[in-house]
Amino acid sequence: MARLMIKNALILMLIASSAAAAGTSSINWIQVFPGTSPTPRSYLAMTYDEASQKVILFGGYDGTKHLNDTWIFDGVTWTRVNASIAPPARSAAQIAYDRVTRKVILFGGFNGRQYLGDTWLWDGNTLRWTRTTPVHSPPAVTGPMLFTDPNGHVDEFGGFDGHFYQATMWQWNGSGWSQLYPAQVPYARGLAAVGVNTLRNEAVMFGGLADVNPVNTWTYDGKTWTLQSTRIQPLWVYAGSAVFDPNLRAVVLFGGGSGGMDQNSTWAWTGSQWKQLLASQVPLPREGAGIAYAAALGGTLIFGGQDGNLLLNDTWRLAP
């Protein structure tokens, strides 16, 4: 899937701009062995649903087809939800939890033929999907960035529409999308990693695919984006996985693709700098994995993704 987006991206020499060494801390990744699991896939959509206190996973790509199955994880096992209505099959969509409406919002993606711009709501209490018909919507894109902004709403930024990377920003208002116009926005990109630090009330964005250098770190406080000056930062990656981990008091970034080589390094954004986290055991390198933080389920979890052509369906938990 990432190759579809790399087509128009200028990615040469980006890797060289990342620093090699930083202050380090130790963590541990622990593999979880659920009774059942979704089939191997990458570029799935995954988040924590606060309403049901479970992780929700939707769709992805299994190497031959795009998927539209829905799964929930309760900390012990993955369970497939037999929803009578569900979003059409896709990969590289994104989902995020809206604290205002207490719904999970799904937007965008790619189905093998076209870029998608439909919006769906997931109700974790009823286990039902509902399609919305907003008057205004973000452009149809693959690889958008969806995140719960510091005000509790779901925001959407960027993505790739088949011709251009986007730099527009939108917010879900409960019944439709409203375009936002911050004074400054990150350079246009898709497949960046985004996590929201709920202690500092700021979103953190790193990397992605772009026509202009995406090897940079941006923060968003609910009103303004700020480009951070960092002496040390992770290797440039696209389709990395990021989430805020309160145990570490930092946004954690794991894996991602980098110039055709998938990664399995773990980094933490502390609020002012990146710090590499070292572990004695780490998951396989991967891009397009799902990530979510769920304190009730054991902390930060990752699932699936792909290491080169190897599709994965393993589940891991981060232990600080």
Tell what function each PLM region has:
Residues 22-320:
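Kelch-like beta-propeller repeat domains
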Residues 1-10:
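Bacterial N-terminal signal peptides that target proteins for export
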Residues 9-18:
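Bacterial N-terminal signal peptides
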